[in-house]
From Swiss-Prot:
Residues 6-221 form the ABC transporter domain. It comes from the Bacteria. The gene is znuC. The lineage of its organism: Bacteria, Pseudomonadati, Pseudomonadota, Gammaproteobacteria, Pseudomonadales. GO terms for cellular component: plasma membrane. Pfam families: ABC_tran. It is a peripheral membrane protein. One of its GO terms (molecular function) is ATP binding. It comes from Pseudomonas syringae pv. syringae (strain B728a). Coiled coil: none annotated. Its EC number is 7.2.2.20. This is Zinc import ATP-binding protein ZnuC.
Length: 262
């Protein structure tokens, strides 16, 4: 296990009598980017909680490198509008952080100008970068990013993906990223894992970023994006259970070599 930062082995979680995660196998190595995708209710948030140690699985194991430093970027942050909180004060909630460290982290993510702004007054894109800066302040070996491009347009997504790649290269940290998009992912992703309570399939995203039509559609940061094709041999009902019906379904796909579901 020494080559991994974190490894999940046959992890299963049951909540309120429902199987939320079943037989999950997942690992992230230093410098590796793993993107977790899946529909709403697929168990992505539960898996992240297990990775962060906030939830103990009912069976299976979650192994972490001893003294692993984790930087977590939440999906969103709700701040009371009446709370007098600047970006600097927010970042200084991280133990040991002073103005110099906060300014350096903000500059690294391209948000240096907002350091003294009220956190309630910055844009959604600026908030994403502030949350990313906060995660970096922990000098992480593993970055866990929960839908970091949520609410950002496609051009903004490409820009943020380029930034995340640069941060990975600079800090040599592993990255576990949750994405709401089932097909458009970061091109530098080493592995895409499609989750719907179990691992439906996994693999490397198709590199289409140099296609002229793709570049025209997504602009100068098109190289940051790639398409992921799913390879399922099964479908799920409305409750997430696997449907073993011999009749063909419009959303059932050919089983690929990378599929983890037997």
């Amino acid at each position: 296990m020494s080559d991994a930062l974190i490894r999940l082995d046959k992890v299963a979680v049951t909540l309120s009598g429902q199987n939320v995660l079943d037989d999950i196998q997942l690992s992230v190595k230093p410098g590796e980017i793993v993107t977790l995708i899946g529909p709403n209710g697929a168990g992505k948030t539960t898996l992240v909680r297990a990775v962060l140690g906030l939830l103990k699985p009912d069976s299976g194991t979650v192994w972490r490198k001893p003294k692993l430093r984790v930087g977590y970027m939440p999906q969103k942050l709700h701040v009371d509008q009446t709370l007098p909180l600047s970006v600097l004060r927010f970042l200084r909630l991280v133990p040991g952080v002073d103005r110099t460290a906060a300014a350096s982290a903000l500059e690294e993510v391209g948000a240096g100008k907002v350091i003294d702004s009220p956190i309630q007054g910055i844009s959604g894109g600026e908030m994403q970068r502030v949350l990313l800066a906060r995660a970096l302040l922990r000098k992480p070996e593993l970055l866990v990013l929960d839908e970091p491009v949520q609410g950002v347009d496609v051009a903004g997504q490409a820009e943020l993906y380029s930034l995340i790649t640069r941060l990975r290269d600079r800090h040599r940290c592993g990255v576990l990223m949750v994405s709401h998009d089932l097909h458009l992912v970061m091109s530098t992703t080493d592995q895409v894992v499609c989750l719907n309570r179990h691992v439906c399939c996994s693999g490397h995203p198709e590199q289409v970023s140099h296609d002229p039509a793709f570049v025209e559609l997504f602009g100068k940061n098109a190289q940051s994006l790639a398409i992921y094709h799913h390879h399922h041999d099964h479908a799920h009902d409305l409750h997430g259970a696997v449907v073993n019906d011999a009749a063909p379904l419009s959303h059932t796909h050919v089983h690929g070599d990378s599929c983890k579901h037997g």
